[in-house]
Amino acid sequence: MNLLFHFLFFVGSLFNNTNGYKPGDVATDFSLKSVDGKMVSMSDYKNAKGFVVVFTCNSCPFAVKYEDRLNAFAKNYTSKGYILIAINPNDASVKPEDSFEKMQVRAKEKQFTFPYVYDEKQTIYPQYGATKTPHIFLLDKNRVVKYIGAMDDNADDAEMVKERYLENAIEALEKGIEPTPATTKAIGCSIKAKKLG
């Protein structure tokens, strides 16, 4: 009976973790293969002031609309100590356009100025609780989650953006205060999980 209780508690804890991180949680590091063939971890960046982990892909129209914005962000903020790491969480057997080889092509075409890595085993995105591409997680230098959601308030048109959620959250961190809002709704395509069986 005691064994059954422990088993049910363990199973229950698995389900409780499916929601992923919330602001204030500490995110675990990862080691994922980048399009240049190197393994990338947050621990590689010893002097980082924070990290922007964005789950994105090649195939989603919303993700494509944010590529130039992510490039511009990386150019502006990497020198300020905020490291952007883009993670493709999609399974290539479901979305062939999101294969590692196609990621390499896309990164070269768009001249990405940030690491673009592949969550091939699909172990990282569930930990974070990412559900869309794109889906952004801002972490401080200690990997404490500070903001989750959309980059800004206009997925369709960068010229019409009124609220820059991610940049505002970083400004809050720079001032030593908590970002408000700490969460927004991520707008994008659902992440394509590997089909079982």
Per-region residue spans from a language model:
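Thiol-/selenol-based redox modules, centered on thioredoxin-like
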Residues: 138-197
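Bacterial Sec-dependent N-terminal signal peptides
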Residues: 1-20
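Short active-site neighborhood of thiol/selenol oxidoreductases, capturing the structured segment around
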Residues: 41-64, 84, 170
